[in-house]
Amino acid sequence: MLLQRFFTRALHSTRQLYAGSGGSGGLEKSALAALRKKTGYTFANCKKALEKHNNDVGLAEKWLHEQAQTLGWSKATKVADRATAHGLIGVLIRGNRGAMVELNCETDFVARNDTFKRFVDHVACMCLQYTDLTDFDGDLWKLGFDADALRNLRTEEGRTLGDHLALLIGAIGENATIRRALCFKANNDLKLVGYAHPAPTNVGTTEGITQVGKYGAIVAYRSTHPLLDFEFHKSICQQIVGMKPTKIGEYDKDKPAENKDDETCLIHQEYLLDADKTVGEALQEHNCEIVDYHRFECGEHTERSLEAIIRSQHQSSN
């Protein structure tokens, strides 16, 4: 569970927790051990839950989760006004589906915390699963989520991501927000590739591998090359993360910038892995066409909505 310790101190030692009273009210060691293993909560709280529910592990577990949720929402309310200037981008690709999410927190220390990273992965997986509910015509489908829409997404057990966010806040002890997400789904011969930077940490799940970092990119491409060159396609994501192109560009409409350092058109930019060629030349060598892309930078100021950005990129790529 996201909130594995919703009380920070155990009031008794492990020996005291296991010691029964000798009477009918004593705790069974097996029940205490099972509840502790299943929930991850402290021995003190597992003991308290079992005592309240006459050693019924099921009822004790339910009570623990309810207490954790209540404390999480209480903490979330108290810290809601605190700024969340740090955080992570999560990028998850599975087959023809992709999701990129941004979550924010108060400190870089928490952003490096495994609990926070797992929650980034959880949100990315929820967004990826949402794409399964959508059928569409055409080659590429994209959908942006703002903070409100993300918080209202429901998980399989019926809770919202907002509920899970409250649990996270209770666990990490500081404010956190789910800022935005973007889903991709490709049809026909289109493929997706994603990348997070710097030195991405991978969080494994049943949905795939979520990369987390301060920057992220997802690229939709079409390739007629007989062999799929993952490293090359990843390098295009790295190019987009590092050089921040504003559009893909068209050879017959977009002229290269006079100063190559000012180039914002992807196909005319200097290729990061080979300064002697442009990205466009590298793409031609690999029989690859970039159809669409999107870039996230953690904490970046965005005046336009995701929907507006999607529309403008679609128009510029046509």
UniProtKB/Swiss-Prot annotation:
InterPro entries: EF-Ts_dimer_sf, Transl_elong_EFTs/EF1B, Transl_elong_EFTs/EF1B_dimer, Transl_elong_Ts_CS, UBA-like_sf. The keyword Transit peptide applies. GO terms for cellular component: mitochondrion. Belongs to the EF-Ts family. It holds the Pfam family EF_TS. It is found in: Mitochondrion. It comes from Drosophila melanogaster. Keywords: Elongation factor, Mitochondrion, Protein biosynthesis, Transit peptide. SUPFAM superfamilies: Elongation factor Ts (EF-Ts), dimerisation domain (SSF54713), UBA-like (SSF46934). HAMAP family: EF_Ts. Associates with the EF-Tu.GDP complex and induces the exchange of GDP to GTP. It remains bound to the aminoacyl-tRNA.EF-Tu.GTP complex up to the GTP hydrolysis stage on the ribosome. The keyword Hydrolase does not apply. GO terms for molecular function: translation elongation factor activity. GO terms for biological process: mitochondrial translational elongation; regulation of mitochondrial translation. Residues 1-18 form a transit peptide. CDD domains: UBA_EF-Ts. This is Elongation factor Ts, mitochondrial.
